[in-house]
Every structure is written in structure tokens, then in C-alpha cells.
Amino acid sequence: MNLRKMTELNITGKKILIRTDLNVPIKNGVIQSDARILAALPTIEIAIEKKAKIIILSHLGRPKEGCYTKKYSLFPIFEYLKKKLKKTKIYFSDNHLKKVEINSGEILILENVRFNVGELKNDENLSKEYANLCDIFVMDAFGSAHRMQSSTYGIGKFVKIACAGPLLISEINNLKKALKNPKRPMVAIVGGAKVSTKFNVLNKLAAISDTIIVGGGIANTFLAIDNKIGKSLHEPKFILKAKKLRDKYNNIVIPIDSRVGKNFSHKEKCTIKLSSNIEKNEEIMDLGDKTIKKIIKILKKSKTILWNGPVGVFEFPNFRKGTEMIAKAIAENNGFSIAGGGDTLSVIDMFQIKDKISYISTGGGAFLEFIEGKKLPAMKMLEENFHK
């Protein structure tokens, strides 16, 4: 990669604009999970130590562009960081055009970039306004690296120096570790609702993995190739594509038994049945015990594990066993494990295995697009800026 790295630049006394990912769940002004903030902190702390003048940009949620909405404000994150970085002076501004002077080693947090008209459409004028705020732009938001927006892409055209932050570099290096010359056997676990959103990822992973395990609605679409699956969530239009993929690689583990229920409900009781024996009024909501046992056996032997998505409706107590047992098997594995995607992070939090996964990615869409082999717009921007 031909790009600049923040750690290789002299940032002392310079105004640096860090585009980070502080898109955390907030309920009634209270942060529900600080995982992304904690991931972003080391970069901020390096900048403080180097006595840079630090300006922070981030998005939060999906507000209506141009409209301030309190529930999407970064103010709770500003308050969180004030408590976390007690020795550092931190300021907050609700307008990126409002001039706020800060000294070396101080931080200015700007309001949610998605309140700014033109952010999502990569508006040139907004990109210029961001560029005018700094001497150096630091792209550190891997979770937004797949978005061609003003604060993640457009700014690179107008800022003199754009560089990659330590978190972004770490994300890329760890994904490459899993995807290029992984220690074998390599196992990929892909769960979630829709094959359609992850088909290209499945195709890529099936080609490079020794075994690929599918779960959730994705597994149901594979099951529907040869079985009647009642009212289970699946995508009929993708059954033929799933069949071609299965037949081409012959390394996809499809559930031999499943936990089923008659109603999609938190209190629904489960029955374990062979996946070939599902009734019309039943829906598959988790893996069965035989399948779980088979998967755990595979995971015990693996040296590299890439994990994206739960394998069942883990939010329902009676349908979380598959996801829980797989999560714990990954945690007990001594090889290299990497996990990514919003629901995957929720599972990791639920079963308290954060410290037992080798690397937890902050990316969802970016994580999947990188696996697919797509060039992420943020990486393209950094390379173009390097050659300016």
C-alpha cells in the first residue's frame, strides 16, 4: 500500500483532523456499548502525546441530513471522553465552520458529520470546508472506509496531507493475515439473514477456506436446495446460486438438524428436528445439537477462524445455543481468530468473550467489502493523496 501513516509523520503542533468511528449505540443519552470508542482511543492518545491540535470527526446513526436531532448528537460521546481523558482539555462544537482555537495536546470534537448537508453525497464544498480545518487529515474510521462521503473520501482531494491512522492500519493488516496465506485449516463462519447481501463474500471465502460454515437465514437458503423448510426465513431467488456454490466448492457445512418453532417469538419453545423433516407451520431459528457438535469438532482443529454473523436468533433464549456454543468454541481456540459485523459484536458482548478473540474488527460493511476484494474508497483516497 502506497500511503502515509500517522505514526510516521511529525504531527507536533499541527492541526490534525481525525475521521474516526464513534458510531456507538446510545439510548436516552446513555452509551450502551463503548467498544468503538475504546478502539478509537489509542490513536487519539498518540496524538495527545505528540502534542498535536486534535479535531475529531465522526458520524452517529442515520439522521435526516441538515436537521439537528438530539438522539444523534455526539455530545454524550464528548462527555464520555471528558471522563476518560481527564488530563486533556476537550471542547465541543456544533458547527464545523465556527472558529474554535485549541492548543497543542487539546481536543475539539465536532458535531455529527451527517447533520451537514452534502456529507452523504460527497459534496465538494463540504469536503473543502473539512480540508480547511487542518494541516493533516487522519483517516482512522475503518467502519466507514467503504463509504464515498465528504469526511471519508472527498476531503482527500483538497487536503495537503492525508494519512492512515493506527486503527485503520491494524484493521487492514489483521484482515490480510486471515485472507492472505492463513495458517491452515482455515474456517469461515458466515451467519445472518440474507444470502443476497453476502453472496460475493461466501463465494470468496469458499474459494480460500478449508471449511465454510453457514447459519441463520443464509443456511436456510442452502437447506431449501434439497429440503422443504416450512416458513423459515430464506431467499427463493438465490436457491439456484446457492446450489451452484455448494456444488462448486463442496466445503460448505449445512445444518443436518435444526431448532424450530411455530412462532417468531421471544418466549417460543424449541424442538430439535432433522433439517430434512421440517413441517409447513415450522420455522428454523437455530442449529440442532448434531450440527453444533460437528461444527465444534471442526473449530477445535482450525488454525485460522474468520467469523461474521450469528447462526441463529440469539436474541431469543431458546434459540441462542448454536451461536453461544460456536462463540465459546472460537474463544477456546488457540489459533488466530478475527470477528466483524454489528451482530457479531453483540454476540461477543453477550457471551463476554472479547478478550479471547484475536482481533475484533470495527467494520460491518467495510469488513465484508474488504473480504470480497473490493477497493475501499478510503484506501483509494489515501493512495491518491500520497501520489499528489
Swiss-Prot record:
It comes from Buchnera aphidicola subsp. Schizaphis graminum (strain Sg). GO terms for biological process: gluconeogenesis; glycolytic process. Its EC number is 2.7.2.3. Signal peptide: none annotated. Its main location: cytoplasm. It is an enzyme of class 2 (transferase). The gene is pgk. It holds the Pfam family PGK. InterPro entries: Phosphoglycerate_kinase (IPR001576), Phosphoglycerate_kinase_N (IPR015824), Phosphoglycerate_kinase_sf (IPR036043). SUPFAM superfamilies: Phosphoglycerate kinase. This is Phosphoglycerate kinase. The keyword RNA-binding does not apply. It catalyses: (2R)-3-phosphoglycerate + ATP = (2R)-3-phospho-glyceroyl phosphate + ADP. HAMAP family: Phosphoglyc_kinase. It comes from the Bacteria. GO terms for molecular function: ADP binding; ATP binding; phosphoglycerate kinase activity. Belongs to the phosphoglycerate kinase family. Keywords: ATP-binding, Cytoplasm, Glycolysis, Kinase, Nucleotide-binding, Transferase. GO terms for cellular component: cytosol. Substrate binds at D21, L22, N23, R36, H59, L60, G61, R62, R114, R147. Pathway: Carbohydrate degradation; glycolysis; pyruvate from D-glyceraldehyde 3-phosphate: step 2/5. Monomer.
